[in-house]
């Protein structure tokens, strides 16, 4: 399902972020896609208005998932330099690693949307 179908559930800030996310995906900006995917999820989780239609058990299940933890770790590795990380070695394979990670981040974001906004 397209992320556009969930636009109506998002607050104005997240709508702007989702538009930027879509542009980054279309333009193969893999790092930006990874960072924005978690930013959008974090904004959903911190928006108290979402409590009206998101089940607390769904939130708990999602934030304790392996995928969510992977996304947070990967985003933090990108933003907070603590030595060389895979995907940043300026080789042809590095771009492929970031692309694969970006596709995984996209899958996690779509999973978040489908679980929260049923």
Question: Which residues fall in each region the model found?
Answer:
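A short, mixed-charge helix-start or loop-turn motif at secondary-structure junctions
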Residues: 2-4, 57, 91
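Short, charged amphipathic alpha-helical segments flanked by flexible coils
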Residues: 46-77
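Short, hydrophobic, well-ordered secondary-structure elements
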Residues: 22, 27-48
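Non-transmembrane, amphipathic alpha-helical segments
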Residues: 6, 25-29, 60-63, 94-97, ...
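Charged alpha-helical initiation segments
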Residues: 1-29
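Charge-enriched, short contiguous segments at helix-coil
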Residues: 70, 74-118
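Amphipathic, well-ordered alpha-helical segments in soluble domains
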Residues: 13-17, 36, 74
